[in-house]
Amino acid sequence: MKMNKQDLMDMHAIQALTDADMQKVNQTILAQINSDVPMVNQLGFYIVQGGGKRIRPLIAVLAARALGYESDKVATCATFVEFIHTASLLHDDVVDESDMRRGRATANSAFGNAASVLVGDFIYTRAFQLVAQLQSLDILRIMADATNVLAEGEVQQLMNVTDPDTTEESYMRVIYSKTARLFEVAAQSVAIVSGAEKSIETAFQEYGRYLGTAFQLVDDVLDYSANAAALGKNVGDDLAEGKPTLPLLHAMRHGNPQQAALIREAIEQGGKRDAIDEVLAIMAEHKSLDYAMDRAKQEAKKAVDAIALLPESEYKKALISLAYLSVDRTY
């Protein structure tokens, strides 16, 4: 399906197309976050009702509809993937000592580190309970592998923090592990549960991988280019945390010796925001944000190409549109 930009759906159109399915997913999320332990309920509801994009469940819903597949298992797939993502955010915010996400206090800021870690553990294990309901060893395998890879990505990112010698390859590996792999699972699990051919499963796996990579690249650009209200977190958090993301690595690699030294020091120090204006100026001079955005657009195009074999439908059109929308956003 060759589409011009004016033919693409906007997010409102995609949401309208999937409204009934996403309502079912949200109902499943709320039902499955429930616990007899009050703190689990309180913190769990706080995090799942925190205004997230729900893009992983959306991918699962669109993939199922593109295959003409209808089943309660779709909501189960969408929910277990969202739970893995949600649990990882709870743990992430503790590790990063973050105090703001999606425009409000993080769970660790509101409830404390111990509660956030433990409820994150609960949500992880609830995800595995949901997978067990699907009675599919293939889905269990990809979910277990993805969770393991995600954990490795967290550790790799921790190793990269305050390390200005982090390579672009290492950075991209973290993106795949922490973000793209779960996007893969969102689409691939639906293909498996629907009984689709292996070629379709592979196509959705690749779509998720490339879309997830594009999505995270844009997130890392927005950390330096958005405003805090739109972004839902503090601008420049990555620099303050000493995270060497692609825009920063590009600026350091292409800057003159003085500029490179300034960025190296900013990464090594971490936790300081006083260098942000100088770093932004260096990025602007060397078009580092443009470089990262170009990489994101390449990944989005790969995502679109990956699902070329799907039959034409409004849902395929929505999947294509979602790939391009992932790089054309301000939050």
Give the role of each language-model region:
Residues 1-331:
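All-alpha prenyltransferase/terpene-synthase fold signal
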